[in-house]
Amino acid sequence: MELHHIRDIADPLTRVIKDDPVRPHIPLEQRINQAAEILLLKAGEEILAATCLQWLTEIPKNEEDLKTVSNSKNVAVFYTIWSYSPGAGAALIRQAADWILKEHSEVRDIVTLSPQTEMARKFHLKNGALVHQTNETSVNYRYYHKAATE
């Protein structure tokens, strides 16, 4: 299984967004820009899972916060995830988090912007996340936090 990055809106693999069960209304141009990309978990040519990643300076509380385009890579936010194969969503989160920590030393937090559903809660807690905060319409699950150095 390999992690694949979609960073060009002309990439034919962007077709996967039609299957987004969480935030299907978010346009492609918001999913892929200087501060956002789509990550896929693939086995050969087969797509096993997909997630959308947004880079921000602060942990978002709602979808509106995702519209901030920043050059900062302090906070990595997974704001939707879906899979086509059992266990692939969990594997994608693990591989994506490993890649973020390896390639982006400046990252302070790896979090989600998740719906307030039991399915999301079970998925993220089972995969090692902690509840960071509950917002009016969402929950942030935290997969990584770099403690401030004194």
What are these model-predicted stretches?
Residues 33-35:
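Short, small/polar residue-rich loop motifs at catalytic or cofactor-binding pockets
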Residues 55-57, 116, 145-148:
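Non-catalytic surface loops within mature trypsin-like serine protease
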Residues 1-30, 150:
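Short amphipathic alpha-helix that is part of the acyltransferase structural core
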Residues 47, 130-133:
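Residue-level detector of beta-propeller blades
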Residues 137-150:
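C-terminal "cap" of GNAT-fold acetyltransferases
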Residues 64-128, 136:
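Acyl-donor binding region in acyl/amide transferases
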Residues 40, 45-57, 61, 77:
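Conserved beta-strand in the GNAT
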Residues 25-27, 63-66:
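A generic local structural motif
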